[in-house]
């Protein structure tokens, strides 16, 4: 007689973390993931705060301006404005000592701006982490997430680091089209931003990337060699086809004839298209960090002194300085009325050209 003894196998219950991990990473129409716990709530709150502010909230108490659709603004002039200078770097929490739980007072004090700025920054970081997470799940390299770090760096440097280096959130850009244009004028007038090499690298990166994208797209279209049956390019090819339908060799020969030099392989070509805009944006973010600390490395004082002493001496730099002084004299009184600024003669617009 044979007796079989079956060992009792104790089934281990999945932990709460495993259950959450399984649910978050489940295959669905919109991937959630752990990064989604940061991305979706923060993006929802940031966008909701912006729509609420531009629709209903005035900037009368912080800037002396109308800034909402309710007051008659349009899409270009509506904005969620920065808090007043008197608030300094307060986080302006709804339950904090400034608003004390009063939502109307919180909006009047610019609380929506800090709300949108902080939730917006965390939403962008969550989106970058989302790209990391999905790339890891499908075994891709993380270059998409690395590339997205560049616009995050620009956002954080302009909206958070720059005002932290100044006297308060007041000096950050407001969240609106005209508000950001005003901030650009402010940057030029008070920091001579267009002469800053870091700004120049940023412009070269963005415009260079646009040029590279245009050249790359046109070259691929020009070297298609397997025409499909569709009426146009968009319907001619199956998006899941395995084979390529354009010729890298033909493209290489074409640009070799145009410039005498061309990319020899796709890896170097696409890395360069990644490198140009990402490096440019990171350099501009570093430049804004310098402005936050009020660095004056690119003020050519010797030319300014000579232009002041010699009526016949003028350079493109001194012409720009003259315009900057006009911007300062015009903006400061409007932009900072609480300071009651009185300008001495030497800082008012002067010079030979105007």
From Swiss-Prot:
One matching Pfam family: Photo_RC
Ligand binding (a plastoquinone): 216, 263
Localization (cell): Plastid, Chloroplast thylakoid membrane
Catalyzed reaction equations: 2 a plastoquinone + 4 hnu + 2 H2O = 2 a plastoquinol + O2
Record-listed Fe cation binding positions: 216, 270
Keyword Acetylation: yes
One function term, GO molecular function aspect: chlorophyll binding
Record EC number: 1.10.3.9
Amino-acid positions noted as binding chlorophyll a ChlzD2 in the UniProt annotation, renumbered to this chain: 119
Co-factor remark: The D1/D2 heterodimer binds P680, chlorophylls that are the primary electron donor of PSII, and subsequent electron acceptors. It shares a non-heme iron and each subunit binds pheophytin, quinone, additional chlorophylls, carotenoids and lipids. There is also a Cl(-1) ion associated with D1 and D2, which is required for oxygen evolution. The PSII complex binds additional chlorophylls, carotenoids and specific lipids.
PROSITE patterns: REACTION_CENTER
GO BP annotations listed: photosynthetic electron transport in photosystem II
Stored CDD domains: Photosystem-II_D2
Similarity comment text for this entry: Belongs to the reaction center PufL/M/PsbA/D family.
Extra information: 2 of the reaction center chlorophylls (ChlD1 and ChlD2) are entirely coordinated by water.
Protein name as catalogued: Photosystem II D2 protein
Native species: Chlorokybus atmophyticus
